[in-house]
Amino acid sequence: MTVQTSKNPQVDIAEDNAFFPSEYSLSQYTSPVSDLDGVDYPKPYRGKHKILVIAADERYLPTDNGKLFSTGNHPIETLLPLYHLHAAGFEFEVATISGLMTKFEYWAMPHKDEKVMPFFEQHKSLFRNPKKLADVVASLNADSEYAAIFVPGGHGALIGLPESQDVAAALQWAIKNDRFVISLCHGPAAFLALRHGDNPLNGYSICAFPDAADKQTPEIGYMPGHLTWYFGEELKKMGMNIINDDIAGRVHKDRKVLTGDSPFAANALGKLAAQEMLAAYAG
């Protein structure tokens, strides 16, 4: 006998009119164990360069009908790339716009994963006690030890990051100083911070979560309503090219900008980023 799971968004009782994804959508798009593999870096980096993670600090995203989507950073999209980079020898720091703790989509946490969960527990304090991004930006110069900026996905990346002058300044610094920029899924929404000033990403090609897919997710209760705007449309207006129209786990490299299309690309993006950064800094 087949048990039917509900497509109704689930109530988040921590906030008025807020909702988690439906049981059905979670059954289709989350798993208690990740697809982490290929973590093999026999000659890891031994230097001081590290990763700056720009994380989400807000949980609730308004939708077109007034309901709130309970979101944050997607755990798979955050932790799998970092697992690879850490195994390759690169430590990381976490910053948020406010300096307040990172918000995660805990409903997507691979809670039975025997590698990812210990890694998360080991580094949880970094996400609970992040740096304030403005303080990091104020200290950036050509000699700063950050080798890359990583913006994880999850719909939380749509909140605050696209309008942040500090995000714009961090990205401008990274591109102009030949550092890596790594992102996936909804994370590239942060690139919209460059819209109203110097935009060094004009003409770059990336993978990202397709707007067309976002427009379909309310049908299965992943979100309680439709988005009020779509970041892919806006990225194209600022001169960026999104090369994928589906979510097949695709990754892409354009110079030092490394991107993936969805949580299905998290492991592959981690591999790509680790390999590229080792070639640049440990070769």
From Swiss-Prot:
EC number(s) recorded for this UniProt protein: 3.1.2.-, 3.5.1.-, 3.5.1.124
Give the annotated active site: 185 (nucleophile)
Q: Name one GO cellular component term.
A: cytoplasm
Q: Tell me, using the record's free text, what induces this protein.
A: By heat shock.
**Catalytic activity, reaction form:** N(omega)-(1-hydroxy-2-oxopropyl)-L-arginyl-[protein] + H2O = lactate + L-arginyl-[protein] + H(+); N(6)-(1-hydroxy-2-oxopropyl)-L-lysyl-[protein] + H2O = lactate + L-lysyl-[protein] + H(+); S-(1-hydroxy-2-oxopropyl)-L-cysteinyl-[protein] + H2O = lactate + L-cysteinyl-[protein] + H(+); N(omega)-(1-hydroxy-2-oxoethyl)-L-arginyl-[protein] + H2O = L-arginyl-[protein] + glycolate + H(+)
Q: Which Gene3D superfamilies match?
A: 3.40.50.880
Q: Which UniProt keywords apply?
A: Cytoplasm, DNA damage, DNA repair, Hydrolase, Metal-binding, Stress response, Zinc
Q: Does the entry feature the keyword DNA repair, yes or no?
A: yes
Q: Which GO terms describe its molecular function?
A: glyoxalase III activity; protein deglycase activity; thiolester hydrolase activity; zinc ion binding
Annotated residues for binding of Zn(2+): 86, 91, 123
Please list the GO biological process terms of this entry: DNA repair; methylglyoxal catabolic process to D-lactate via S-lactoyl-glutathione; protein repair
InterPro entries (UniProt xref): Class_I_gatase-like, HchA, Prot/Nucl_acid_deglycase
Q: In which compartments does the protein localize? A: Cytoplasm
Q: How does it assemble?
A: Homodimer.
Its biological purpose is as follows: Protein and nucleotide deglycase that catalyzes the deglycation of the Maillard adducts formed between amino groups of proteins or nucleotides and reactive carbonyl groups of glyoxals. Thus, functions as a protein deglycase that repairs methylglyoxal- and glyoxal-glycated proteins, and releases repaired proteins and lactate or glycolate, respectively. Deglycates cysteine, arginine and lysine residues in proteins, and thus reactivates these proteins by reversing glycation by glyoxals.
Family under the similarity heading: Belongs to the peptidase C56 family. HchA subfamily.
Xref: HAMAP family: Deglycase_HchA
Protein name per Swiss-Prot or TrEMBL: Protein/nucleic acid deglycase HchA
The species this protein was found in: Escherichia coli O139:H28 (strain E24377A / ETEC)
